[in-house]
Amino acid sequence: MGSSSSKSSSSVTVASSIDYKAKPTIDELGTSNYSGGLEVSKNLLDFNLGEKPCPLKSVVQDQFTISNSSKTKLKFHFEPLQPKEFQLSFSPTSGSLDKGKSKTIKVKLMVNQKINTNHKVVLRVEGGASHFLTVKIRCETGVFGVDPNTLEHVEDEGFRVPYILALMKRSLIDNGGLQQEGIFRLAGEQTEIKRLKEAMNRNDFTSSTDINTVASLIKIWYRELPTPILNSIPTEKIFYSTDIDECVQSAKNLPEPQKSLLDWLMHLLLMVSSFSDVNKMTAQNLAIVVAPNLYDVSSSNPMEGLVLSQKCVQFLHNVLSHKVAVHKRESVAYEVLS
């Protein structure tokens, strides 16, 4: 989700040097030139809590190892990060690592208020690629960042989904969201996003006229799932399913509740794309802004993560394009029969 709330009137354009139809080579994934860099033992920091809530005002700890498999000394540092909701520290915060050596990084976290989030931390390597670590924080029950099976479900246009999704969709539609230019691309105001998210977690939300905020919260809901939707599909299926039918079949083979959650979302995006002449959000544009919320691309190999991110966009575009094509055929058939 983007951070800008500017209401630009231009449509999204796409420019990519990646050939989606070509299978990625070893060089494309960065494997061949990455073996001589900094390696990280794990990318998810959950402080050994699993699904247990993180305590407030108490320090929890985790650790991981970085190793230098290059032929030269490497310098590294963690980018400064001090959100007001929590304190996070790495020890050491910077340093150097001789070739062939390893170092243990100790991590301390203290949460000041109840939040559910997956926070990204950047580990920079001088003259090399960056690493992205995910800090998993779960402090409260609610509707964001929790197992969807624990939420109240309803039937929404043939899909069984958590009640909060149906509520946000109704708010979006009732307030003209389907016709809003840049819907799902333009971000809502951060203060309003936070306020409404907290209200939803308290089960104290009915509707909102700020449709960009509601659209942002739908993306956030998917992004903060304990297991992102597309992570339930084998990685090789994302990389190599260049054929639309293969992508559709992979989506159909998803386990529940991921399958219903993806089907519901695709139906909503289909509705949005049907007004693309007004809202400027085609299937391709929607895939670009929504796909990053459906897959956690954290990887010890940043280049692989970059390629995988683009493959996820193409995967989602293929699935959505199929639904658009089916909808058009059914509409034509209905008109003929009428």
Curated annotation (Swiss-Prot):
One Pfam family of this chain: RhoGAP
Entry-linked CDD domains: RhoGAP (cd00159)
Major localisation: cytoplasm
Location within or outside the cell: Cytoplasm
Source superkingdom: Eukaryota
GO cellular component, one term: cytoplasm
Gene3D superfamilies associated with the record: Immunoglobulins, Rho GTPase activation protein
Single GO term (MF): GTPase activator activity
Residues marked Arginine finger (site): 185
Main function: Rho GTPase-activating protein involved in the signal transduction pathway.
Protein name according to UniProt: Rho GTPase-activating protein gacA
Lineage: Eukaryota, Amoebozoa, Evosea, Eumycetozoa, Dictyostelia
Primary gene name: gacA
